[in-house]
């Protein structure tokens, strides 16, 4: 009886569609679902597999979100954060990137690349001085 239960559980697990939602587009574009379409494909067992349509290859959704936002100061183009100065913009992926402020009032985001904190900024500074 136990082996039958395990077989049924394994079969149900294999037939169940799994979809990973990382929330990036919901977070980035407000999650309105505009233009998001699902396609259903039937299988021999009567099941349905959901496939989301790829994001459009143009930046129309991004531009629409950008236009809807209000910011009295500076609206960061990559994170859509409202800050006082461009070099205050946060990195889009702070868990994986280190923000480095440049002398010209700009900032760049550099991948940690497995280095300890501050090491990426040190390497950028060495490169700017021509030492790397």
Swiss-Prot record:
Extent of the signal sequence: 1-20
Alphabetized PANTHER family for the sequence: LONG CHRONOLOGICAL LIFESPAN PROTEIN 2
| Stretches the record annotates as Disordered | 33-59
For this entry, the protein name equals: Long chronological lifespan protein 2
Indicate yes or no for the key word Membrane: no
Biological process (GO), any one? ERAD pathway
What is the annotated role of this protein in its UniProt record? Probable component of the endoplasmic reticulum-associated degradation (ERAD) pathway.
**Keywords for the protein's UniProt record, in alphabetical order:** Signal
What gene is this protein translated from? LCL2
Q: Which family does it belong to?
A: Belongs to the LCL2 family.
């Amino acid at each position: 009886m136990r082996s039958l239960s395990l077989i049924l559980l394994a079969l149900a697990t294999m037939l169940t569609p799994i979809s990973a939602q990382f929330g990036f587009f919901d977070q980035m574009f407000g999650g309105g679902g505009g233009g998001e379409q699902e396609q259903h494909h039937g299988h021999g067992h009567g099941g349905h597999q959901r496939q989301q349509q790829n994001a459009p290859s143009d930046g129309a959704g991004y531009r629409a979100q950008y236009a809807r936002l209000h910011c009295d100061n500076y609206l960061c183009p990559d994170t859509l954060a409202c800050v006082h100065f461009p070099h205050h913009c946060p990195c889009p992926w702070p868990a994986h990137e280190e923000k480095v402020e440049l002398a010209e009032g700009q900032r760049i985001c550099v991948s940690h690349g497995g280095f300890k904190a501050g090491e990426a900024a040190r390497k950028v500074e060495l490169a700017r001085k021509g030492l790397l």
